[in-house]
UniProtKB/Swiss-Prot annotation:
One of its GO terms (cellular component) is nucleus. This is Probable serine/threonine-protein kinase cdc7. Residues 315-393, 558-588 form a coiled coil. It comes from Dictyostelium discoideum. Its EC number is 2.7.11.1. One of its GO terms (molecular function) is metal ion binding. It comes from the Eukaryota. ATP binds at I628, G629, Q630, G631, T632, F633, S634, G635, V636, K654. Residues 161-171 have a biased composition (Pro residues). The active site is at D741. The lineage of its organism: Eukaryota, Amoebozoa, Evosea, Eumycetozoa, Dictyostelia. The keyword Chloroplast does not apply. The gene is cdc7. It catalyses: L-seryl-[protein] + ATP = O-phospho-L-seryl-[protein] + ADP + H(+); L-threonyl-[protein] + ATP = O-phospho-L-threonyl-[protein] + ADP + H(+).
Amino acid sequence: MNWDSNNNNNKNSNNNNNNSSSSSYNINNNYSSFNNSNNNNINNNNINTNNNNNNNNNNNNNNNNNNNNNNNNNNNNNNKNNSSNNYHLAHINVYQQYPIKPLPISFNSFNTNMFQQQQQQQQQQQQLPQHLPPLGSSGSSNGGPNLMGYAQIPPNYFKPLSPPSFHPPTSPQSFFNNNTNNNNNNNNNNNNNINININNNNNSNNYINDSTNSNNLNTSNGAINTSSHLFINSPNHHSDNRSFIESRSPASMNASPIHFNDPTFKVPVHLPSLSITNSPSLNSSIDSSYRLNNNNNNNNNNGSNNSSFNSTPTKFEQLQLQLQQQQLQQQLQQQQQLQQQQQQLQQQQQLQQQQQQQLQQQQQQQLQQQQQQQQQQLQQQQQLQQQQQQQSTSHIHFSTAPTPIVSHHYNLQQPLQQYPQNIYSHTNILNQNNNSKPINTNSSSSNNNNNNNNNNNNNNNNNNNNNNCNYNNSNNSYNNNTTNTNNNPNNKRSQTKNQQQQQPQPQQQQLQQQQPQQSVINVNKKTTKVSKTKTSNQKLTVNNNNNNNNNNNNNNNNNNNNNNNNNNNNNNTIQQQQQQQSNDIKLLLKNSIYSSRNDLKELLSQPTEYTDSEYPEIVGKYRILEKIGQGTFSGVYKSVCIDGPNIGLIVALKRVAPTSSPARILNEIHSLLRVGGHYNVSALFGALRYKDQVTLILPFFEHDSFKDYFFQMSNENIKHYLYALFDSLRHIHQNNICHRDVKPTNFLYSIKNNSFLLIDFGLAQEMPNSNSNSNSNSNSNSNSNSNSNSNSNSNNNNNNNNNNTNNNFNGNNSNNDFNNFINMNNSNSNNNNNNNSNNNNNNNNNNNNNNNNNSNNNNNSNNSQEEIILPSTNENGTTTSNASSTSNTTSSSSSSSNKSKNLRNDPKPQPAPRAGTRGFRAPEVLLKYNKQTTAIDIWSVGVILLCMISGRYPFFISPDDMTSLAEIVSIIGTKKIVDIAHLLEKKISISHSIPPTPWRDLSRRLRSESSCDKQDVPVELYDLLERCLDPNPLTRITASEALLHPFLVVNNNSNNNNNNS
């Protein structure tokens, strides 16, 4: 390309695009004109080049281009004469490398040996960087960025060159037409142009603008300082493939003049990354791309001069761009994945927060419910206290329906303080200071002093096991009126602790040595909380009366003292002895009450008849105190816990006989776990097993014997008793469990504590959901009139010399649990004379009751026939045992021999369950009906009610099932029992017809003959009795319906009115 300086057709143009100064390279040539404009916001300077007069003007953006006058802001003259010898051409071969490294430099006509030596010396003095150092680092002579390497050039190396010549093509017009292009899209494809992209930035801190110009196809591949003029010399375009860069001394650089003769002179050689592509012919498509990214560090140029020319990218660049695009896409995908993961984490955190909030809300609700329940219990306790203080009648006082116990299961691994101390009782006990009159167990009060079973004379016959003493456990439970009404100076309470802790007198010590220390004292507990440690404020007070209560009435105390004058001396001695014992031993209070460790040690030091070899399962865990019940399949023992967190706890151990089936034991455990602990039903503390021996741990419950109070119960007493019993049965029937052994000895009652407990689920059976059990009412479920108070002690007002009768926990029949038919017309002396006969009858009637309940005799096959023959009965309803009756039975059986032959081909009937106690079995059980329901428990309740109304216990006495059925027929009549048998698909044969006897007439006649309470029985009670003793199990009343009966509802409403008042 020949740059002609004599041409006067220079074209200058300033194009402003997008608020930026845009200048075009105007090559003054007659044959060609190149106009390349860029629409991007890039400042392009005008370069005006003239062969004859090369004027290089570096001006600001607002300066005009002058060809003749060279005006620079920095007063730097860049005009050089082409004819002078100051032009030196350096032939530099630059090779593109990546990453950017110092490029090798080759010189023509140069002594390489000298140069190598100097280069080695220079490397020793200053190590050349392998890569371009960062911006602003040391090494630049002008203070700019170190973007250049240094090559030492010897003197006289540069030679003057003549101005390059340009040989135009033969046809100027064709060249002009081929080379005239106006490119506005930064793309110069198939043009005969040499495009140079130069990015001049005033920021001296920019190294290589790779990242900022990443979207531009003309990316930076190197850096070059373009402050000096660049001349492109291509002398022979048609034959020479080389490109030359002529470098002249830059005048714009504020540096000293260059002395080429100086051997130490170092020519700054810039190291750009150049990609030069030349074609052998100019007429062909020449595409030479010079991509230079230069950081202009020249302080003389006040404006930013950016000149860029675009060309088509090479294949290598295209591949690089594709790789960059792929990398960008991968980065975008990774970012999206990271964002998705972050979103998932956020969602999980939100879910966790929501779950935590829900848990917190549930916990708060549970706490609120517990607080509400506690508040309700406290309110009910306060109401009960107020009601008990208001009650003062001559009969047994019952409180209103108790609150159901919330706790269901009890674990012995946890301390017992977590459980309610009175599990089956109200926390409030009847007021001991009221004027209530207890039941007199003797028929005549005039014979109290002559009765061997008198409570005041038990000290002589029972080894001090039934002494009547009042022990107040709380510090503030002593009544001031007690010391005034009792004419005994020893009953006065000491005022100071010193008086309470005085040493006993010598007489008291002698009495203590003479009398044994194993005497059991009835303790009246005033409060529910008992301290484990000894308190000096505790003191025994003995009242000289039969009531065992601190009565405020002077008349009652005086009367009792007059009746018991013969026992005052004995009571005084007992009091002195117990005062000494109270300072040493704290009595073991019953029903979940602790004793101190000192008392427990002294208790364990006493000899016992129960050895560890006989009871290996309880060795080191429990200590047996006494036996309180014995049956065919189990025995019950009063025991104390001697190890673990529940040390000192009084419990009842039920040792099941090894001969019992495992299914029966498992059935009892499951039944207690399902329904125990609620509505006066016994709970299960735990179980022990040693080989074949299984022992159940049950709560100990102090109670009174049924035969001592049933004939003295008033109508109000009967209401509370029945309400508690029906409430317990409703609870177990709703859980489809039938007790099958409901009787007075299995429904324990404590008169003093006014509490009830249903026990002995050994014969319990799971029943399907029947109609008789389904119609339950929710209104009657919430309230129960039975009181679940289980206090530590009660008054042992029993007429038996045996101590085991007071603690009849098991419910199985023993020799002293039942008496024969009691004739209440006899006097007290007759009762004493008939004790032996009664005991003998008990032995005959109660020998192994459970044998008939759980084992089948040889007569069971005969009883399972469709035709049932009953023994003949008299008009009075009693069975005959003479020879005629037996002959009739045999004749009737012989007459039915033909029928029995026909029954041989019939399939054998299924065995019907007949478990239960004789005298309390329902007609469907006696008739061996297979589809039995929970109605059999209601029949047993009717029998208990009949004993209360008639004053006779037990009411039905029979050795077998047929006799029991004949006794029922003698009362309800022949027609009813035949109809029921036909309804149950049974056939019964009776010798003669018997008319029914109304229950009202029967009970009145028996009640008038007895010495029981002559209070009139209301009509509602007779109606309830008839509905309970309905022979049809389908129409018999249920437990839920019984709770809504008028006899019990009136009582409940009256109690509510009292509470409201």
